[in-house]
């Protein structure tokens, strides 16, 4: 939040953020994960509250367009009503939610991205390092549809850094990403560096300056 106060108006072409939803989602997924896949995450308390409205006002100020995950949990804090939501259809059943929603500032129709992200039915296996991690393929789809010409992107809650990996793959995106949790930052940095070491052309040529390194 502090860093945004020094950012000029409309500095970023797009802000894609996944802030805490304020519903205890992280700990809930920790329990579900133990039951289904034995994946354990550390106990967290940052997901008990969603950001204050001043955060969302700043996001709108510093970026030309915004995509905000989980906004259905704090809709009253959104800058304005929008017809264009993104629905990530997880193609899963049972007690789990059918998918996740993101509010956007775009004026197009609601769009759906279908990608299986549960248990043995995952379309593309990914190492899970964060309780609210999203697949890289989701961000690939977002950039293709909402930022095809590239540009500057802000992510205030980096988490697993799936967004950053997708930006590296795109090759035409300048990404500014922040993560304040030291443990998640360390794990995510290792994940990104592993991706860079695997021979992707753009990954090899794109240098990352780790501003939050501890």
Tell what function each PLM region has.
Residues 1-154, 160-214:
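Class I S-adenosyl-L-methionine-dependent methyltransferase catalytic core
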């Amino acid at each position: 939040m502090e860093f945004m106060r020094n950012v000029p108006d409309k500095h970023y072409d797009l802000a894609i953020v996944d802030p805490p939803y304020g519903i205890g989602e992280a700990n809930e997924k920790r329990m579900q994960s133990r039951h289904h896949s034995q994946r354990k995450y550390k106990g967290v308390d940052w997901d008990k509250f969603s950001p204050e409205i001043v955060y969302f006002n700043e996001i709108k100020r510093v970026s030309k367009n915004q995509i905000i995950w989980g906004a259905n949990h704090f809709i009253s804090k959104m800058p304005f009503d929008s017809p264009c939501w993104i629905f990530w259809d997880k193609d899963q059943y049972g007690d789990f939610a059918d998918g996740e929603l993101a509010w956007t500032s775009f004026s197009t129709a609601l769009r759906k991205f279908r990608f299986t992200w549960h248990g043995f039915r995952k379309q593309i296996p990914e190492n899970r390092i964060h309780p609210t991690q999203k697949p890289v393929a989701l961000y690939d789809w977002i950039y293709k549809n909402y930022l095809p010409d590239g540009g500057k992107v802000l992510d205030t809650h980096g988490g697993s850094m799936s967004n950053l990996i997708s930006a590296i793959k795109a090759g035409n995106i300048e990404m500014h990403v922040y993560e304040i949790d030291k443990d998640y930052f360390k794990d995510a940095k290792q994940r990104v560096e592993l991706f860079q070491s695997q021979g992707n052309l753009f990954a090899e040529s794109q240098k990352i300056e780790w501003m939050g390194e501890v």
